[in-house]
Amino acid sequence: MFKHLNALFIGLALFACTSGAVAQTIKPIETPVPVRPAGQKDVVGLTTPKLDVVRVGFIGLGMRGPGAVERFTHIPGTQIVALCDLIPERVAGAQKILTKANLPEAASYSGSEDAWKKLCERKDIDLVYIATDWKHHAQMAIYAMEHGKHVAIEVPSAMTLDEIWALINTSEKTRKHCMQLENCVYDFFELTTLNMAQQGVFGEVLHTEGAYIHNLEDFWPYYWNNWRMDYNQNHRGDVYATHGMGPACQLLDIHRGDKMNYLVSMDTKAVNGPAYIKKTTGKEVKDFQNGDQTSTLIRTEKGKTILIQHNVMTPRPYSRMYQVVGADGYASKYPIEEYCMRPTQIASNDVPNHEKLNAHGSVPADVKKALMDKYKHPIHKELEETAKKVGGHGGMDYIMDYRLVYCLRNGLPLDMDVYDLAEWCCMADLTKLSIENSSAPVAIPDFTRGAWNKVKGYRHAFAK
């Protein structure tokens, strides 16, 4: 009898422990949210006076800067006023781009680590376009806004929460646009799929996925002074999340009716980073910080989820892992572009072979083409042909720059604001915090400080 009683007591104790564990609520780790200074307002939907001509100064002419200069020579209503890089030869190379386009040379700034400040201080520049290494992005943008300039900053625009809040406060205080140059939101498949989602083709969007999966083994030597490998060596977490986050967040109307509440993240151990350093320098690295693979799961206020991955170390085909999971349909870009949806989501006369649509298989190629044609985004209808001629990651870079100029010239809200920048860049600090606390949930701040529901749904602005 006592045996049975002991077994019963043990069972009840285990049940009580298990029940207690299930009932426990783990409070996410929180980071400080600075109080908005008195008299300062949010910049959700910010508009500024129209600019007949957008006068531009470029800082950083290494890997991405020259391509931006080239693209701007094809954008109407722009004037390239100044060029800056630490290395004089790079400025000279960018001047040749202007000469080839039959444009006058721009003012040159180089040879000093503070030369960029003089560019920002000029009175004849409206927009400062920053394409330097990551660690200089935020400080340059803040200085430029403080001197009355709009700023466009390469990805990632900020690497820490302190930098993010400084950019937000400066944009709010100066009422200047602060846009991150996230090109992947203009990809042809992504933008068409966004249009489909906005028109209800997938039903309610419940889950999105994105990533930056790109083996950089052949590219590490091209980064000036090895800055990118050094950054991965010294920083843990998803340090380059914006290519995946941008399209994912636009699909879910983040800070335009929904907001991200918390994340959990984990990584693998570091293998290929230290191996690469050993191979190229002979040095042993025992404390390489960034794991080869980082995976992050996010939950929003409205119960949606986002999965983000980062991997620049292992052999894998390039992928941004773009996926859309809706209540009534699905889209995926990698490894192949495909759609899946209930037949009821599409009118029978809109696509061929409508009878072949089902909820468990990819639509046939002719149906996919019909969908891509029917839901081609208005931006692509206007710019696709020119974008593919000018180029820049297949044309999406040109569309990004064109839209930036278009909105400034028409006094419209930009396609991406400083809060988008914050939400996509905060992954670096917040994923590290989660990983270093055994993948604990970490709260994602409301960077709008209360304005996340002010606009209902993400949309691009167009002049009337």
Curated annotation (Swiss-Prot):
Q: Keyword Membrane on this protein? A: yes
Q: How does it sit in the membrane?
A: Lipid-anchor
Pfam families documented for this protein: GFO_IDH_MocA, Glyco_hydro_109_C
Instruction: Cite the cofactor comment.
Output: Binds 1 NAD(+) per subunit. The NAD(+) cannot dissociate.
EC number in record:
3.2.1.-
Q: State its location(s).
A: Cell membrane
Q: Where is the lipid attached (N-palmitoyl cysteine)?
A: C17
Sorted UniProt keywords:
Cell membrane, Glycosidase, Hydrolase, Lipoprotein, Membrane, NAD, Palmitate, Signal
Q: Where is the lipid attached (S-diacylglycerol cysteine)?
A: C17
The UniProt record gives the binding positions of NAD(+) as: M63, R64, D85, W134, K135, H136, H137, E154, V155, N183, Y240
The signal peptide here is: 1-16
Function of the protein: Glycosidase.
Q: What is this protein called?
A: Glycosyl hydrolase family 109 protein 1
